């Protein structure tokens, strides 16, 4: 039993020192002040008199009185809610000062400065966090003045979340600076508290089963037997930990501590005899302690894959890496990862004998394994040749070697296995001499991409009996050389990871060498072996692999330096020794075709085969061209026999269909082989280019016609003539003119080996022609051997339409100039003038007739589906701004309502009593300037409301689409065929007008204001509403651009008028048509055109059509009496009225005035558009008869008054913004015009043109009785009563003047001028000269 130790504690009163007395007294006063301050803060009332609040008569509610209220208000103003922590901080400071007495000998000013910085950081960040995240308290900011400054500074830069994160980080740093606590310790403390809480909540303690183990049960039995109480394991461990802590504390003063460091970092085992162990007062070291357990702590946990615990020495992996590097050099940068494969029993693997044996060199360890060439008699150790078999990692598993043949190692035969010796270092390939050239080997048994797998096997030597692999009990713990081993292993793993994964190969059968590498066969034998191949296609494919193996060479031995290995991403390729690569001339001398030449031949055959496939269907033109080509060929053949050209060789051609089919199959197989192996380019191969085709030595030396084909299909035998050196001239190889419609594909009558024929031996210059003929090719037109596969214009020759002169001229052997292929002549000149884009709006294009009676709305651009919502908050702000700006001008007004539209927003102002609306109208420009807007329009009177409107443009303008205006009930339900849409008003409602009720329309606006777009919108509206029998158009377009797009629609009465004289005749015809319609309506007793058409329809329903009452037998060629028919409305559209007035003269004004006065009832309506709204163009007579007007943006208020008789148009925004003054209304309405694109106009026009052609009325633009209407009356008008007398007077006086006629007959000036104009029209007097005088042309009267 243990005894409890007790101690008597007698408290005695001791006197304090003077300094201590003063300190404790001050601490007590400060603590009381903190309590008082807390009471003042908690009882704060905003109504108390304070620093920010002045109150005199109210009682003070604060518990601290007036000072407390004042101090609390100040603290809340400065710190916000953080003021509540100030009393707590004061009390904590007092406690800290009382606990820590002045026992230190010195003051650490650096620590004090760090604490001050931490305090400032905590105060500032706490206030900032409160200002950002907490709610305000009373009328103070939550963070006080300090927090407000920080939050306003951080909000624009980091936003609230970013500012909070930054302040939290600074707060954490400040806490560490102030307290000196590490956040790791804080986290551990918090975790401990949390676990204590959780264990307490679960009614358990953390020490219940912590130290319960088997030893305690053993202790019970020991107590029963021995009767001696043993110490628990927990107590022993705690005592050992305290001992170690004490030793660490005495380390700097105890010299034996430095011996401990030397023992720890010396690399020796701690359980050796000579080592000094330290224990706590003789207690034995714990077997679980890592530092004092020696090798017992890790003895049972052996890991053979651990580089530190696998039992091998440090230098052993370095030697293994060196051996692996040597094997890698032997394989010549194989595409497979480096590996060690265990031997396969029962199989004889192919041994990859390295050309150079390497050995590990002991020395200073570096980052890379150091290797050096081995001596001649060196025998590698078995453990280097066959390292740890049990350590095959997944990336070191045996994989087959699948690479190009240039990467294959040299396999040894069975005989070579027996004679293999360790000291043999015979090189497998030596650098060629000047006379010996390297020759690639055409492999015949295996494809070029599947070499046999090479399995590494140790050299068959007897191991030394004295060496045995042993595993140490435990590796050293503190060898720094193990870092080098780890780096070497990582480098090997990295090289294995970056190498591609090859295809698996069966390993159940032994791999035997089937082929030999290129250096084992002499160059002559290689050529003979290649020539002995019987299949051209197979030999061509294998020759491509052999040519690809050109850069592969083995390493030479005998003092050669170690290979320079490139380390990086991808397979490690060793740099071979310097060898001389065979040149193109040498390859050509052995009959080996270059890869570029074979590719060109295969592509040419592919193009020829494509022409076979595409030339199945022949048109009449192609058949005719073929016939002409056959005639030209026969003529050329006759010329050849005539002049005795005998340079055509005896080339045997296959003439039967079976041979042609066989050649086609061979060509297709060659193309497939080329496509299959075209992607496998060796490392040293150059890409194909046209420069390779112009290599003249190859053309001189290459035997293009060997006795046995090497790499071409063997179905076409070729002869071998004498070769003549011909200098190629590639600049003469001009392709045929690229006209695909006249191309003639090659006919498969006989195979055409023009790409295999030799060059021309006789003519010094090559003769060029088309390489494809329908029958046997002629030599004089045969194209020389030029592989031009990459250029399609050389692969697709064309047959001419007519025989060309070069086919008719005989060949001149002595002519120094070559004959050129003339380009084909273009088609006939009259055919080239027919172009669809030159047709007037594409009249000749065939169109599909629509099935709907009217065009569909799908032809128009649909409006966007998402509409931007109205920002009411921004409108409210603008309303307050308008009120403020009006107040600046001493105008008191309130914004009572606003109407947002697509372009503008109208604010309705309620003016104060006595304020005139004219004051706001006069301030429109000043308001626009003060509101920072483009323009402001003041609406003095809003119908139905006692307010004044102020129209301001929107910040984001919306587009009004014609489709959404046409697709509304107001337009669809209007029965009038003359219904037009204008756009949308300021409220967004569509504005629809009826041209029959206008009855005429005047449109004016400057260039770019949207005038032409508005006219197009009105025309399209009528095209979407009326059939051609309902509405007809007469369009006058002086600019020949705006209305000419409507040419060809069935609504036109005549073609679009672009000549101004024809425009005057069209207006004159309109006046005559108006008079005729009035006569017919008067005969039927109706008042307008609608009543007339109703009468005609009623008569048709009765079956009794109405005859024409004014027809006479001589008026027409009709046998029967013509009947009256339905009359359509006629809309006369003039795009540029000012140009018409300037060109034709004053007569047009009279015609327009007559139409404007009387044409409404006759169904004839005018739409006049002009961009110059001046008084001389829009006269008072026209304005009086055209009440409906549309004003777009104009330049001045004068122009606005010319159009609308009031201002406002100068304040419009442009781009379709208009003021529409409707019929029977004096107040214009602001409308935003519908936007119409040119594509929409063309689509609707094409739709109507597909429905039918226009039925033009003759005689509208021509007048035989007038000279074009250039200012005179037409022949149908009666002459003046005084005309004869005036003619007599002028011819007698020989002087023609308006004033003279006026004085003579005492008439008015206008009548005298009209008489003179009639004389000019009759040819009696001439036109006015430059001085205003007229010359009398008629002779004087006879007396």
Swiss-Prot record:
It is found in: Cell inner membrane. Residues 385-395 have a biased composition (Polar residues). GO terms for molecular function: ATP binding; DNA binding. Pfam families: FtsK_4TM, FtsK_alpha, FtsK_gamma, FtsK_SpoIIIE. GO terms for biological process: cell division; chromosome segregation. ATP binds at residues 1008-1013. Residues 988-1201 form the FtsK domain. Residues 1-24, 99-115, 180-1343 are cytoplasmic. Residues 600-611 have a biased composition (Basic and acidic residues). The chain crosses the membrane at residues 25-44, 75-98, 116-132, 163-179. Keywords: ATP-binding, Cell cycle, Cell division, Cell inner membrane, Cell membrane, Chromosome partition, DNA-binding, Membrane, Nucleotide-binding, Transmembrane, Transmembrane helix. InterPro entries: FtsK/SpoIIIE/SftA, FtsK_4TM, FtsK_alpha, FtsK_dom, Ftsk_gamma, P-loop_NTPase, WH-like_DNA-bd_sf, WH_DNA-bd_sf. Residues 357-475, 556-586, 600-619, 633-863, 1256-1275 are annotated as: Disordered. Homohexamer. Forms a ring that surrounds DNA. Belongs to the FtsK/SpoIIIE/SftA family. PANTHER family: DNA TRANSLOCASE FTSK, SPORULATION PROTEIN RELATED. Consists of an N-terminal domain, which is sufficient for the localization to the septal ring and is required for cell division, followed by a linker domain, and a C-terminal domain, which forms the translocation motor involved in chromosome segregation. The C-terminal domain can be further subdivided into alpha, beta and gamma subdomains. The alpha and beta subdomains multimerise to produce a hexameric ring, contain the nucleotide binding motif and form the DNA pump. This is DNA translocase FtsK. It comes from Salmonella typhi.
